[in-house]
Curated annotation (Swiss-Prot):
Regulates translation as part of a complex with DENR. Specifically required for translational re-initiation in mRNAs containing upstream open reading frames (uORFs). Not required for standard translational initiation. Regulates expression of a subset of gene products including mbc, InR and EcR. This is Malignant T-cell-amplified sequence 1 homolog. GO terms for biological process: formation of translation preinitiation complex; regulation of translation; translation reinitiation. Transmembrane segments: none annotated. It is found in: Cytoplasm. Keywords: Cytoplasm, Translation regulation. Changing residue 82 to A: No effect on translation regulation activity. PROSITE patterns: PUA (PS50890). Pfam families: Pre-PUA, PUA. GO terms for cellular component: cytoplasm; protein-containing complex. Changing residue 118 to A: No effect on translation regulation activity. Reduced translation regulation activity.
């Protein structure tokens, strides 16, 4: 999704959000990520003014007061954390671990296939379909990518074929390389 993202070319407009919209977004984030409650004031302070950067391909970036990209979404999908945020606060998103053989493919933006989640070295945390997940790697401490489960973990174990996680944002893509938006 962010493979060819460049902040100068890809961002079409930036809007300041009204306080009622800010409260709604905070409530949605806390509903989607209950473990985030103790850190939400560090990430998105109540008195801070948030902005939304509208990008090409129906992507929206949620910016905090400093201009850091903290969450993004595609169309009306769920808000997903950026990898920079996940590296600071790693435990509020469900984690799925891929084996060593899948690392280079995930780092090039490929979707995670079911065999990469069920082989020895991989580890799955039980989760439902359409759950936002952090994609971890065997032997690494930080997340490689952020994605959305296309099947529940039980279906992945039973089927073991096809795409298990659709990758949205990965290390060294355009969003990772972009600087804070002023």
């Amino acid at each position: 999704m962010f493979k060819k993202f460049e902040e100068k070319d890809s961002i079409s407009s930036i809007q300041q959000l009204k306080s009622s919209v800010q409260k709604g977004i905070r409530a949605k984030l806390l509903e989607a990520y209950p473990k985030l409650e103790s850190h939400i004031d560090l990430i998105l302070p109540k008195k801070d003014s948030y902005r939304i950067a509208k990008c090409h391909d129906h992507i929206e970036l949620l910016l905090n007061g400093a201009g850091d990209q903290v969450f993004f979404r595609h169309r009306d999908g769920p808000w997903m954390p950026t990898l920079r945020l996940l590296h600071k606060f790693p435990y509020f998103v469900t984690m799925q671990q891929v084996d060593k053989g899948a690392i280079r493919f995930v780092l090039s933006g490929a979707n995670v296939m079911c065999p990469g989640l069920t082989s020895p070295g991989a580890c799955m945390t039980p989760a439902d379909k359409d759950t936002v997940v952090a994609i971890m790697a065997e032997g690494k401490e930080h997340a490689l990518a952020v994605g959305l489960l296309t099947l529940s973990t039980q279906e992945i174990l039973a089927k073991n074929k096809g795409i298990g996680i659709e990758t949205y944002h990965f290390l060294n893509d355009g969003l990772w390389k972009s600087k804070p938006v002023k």
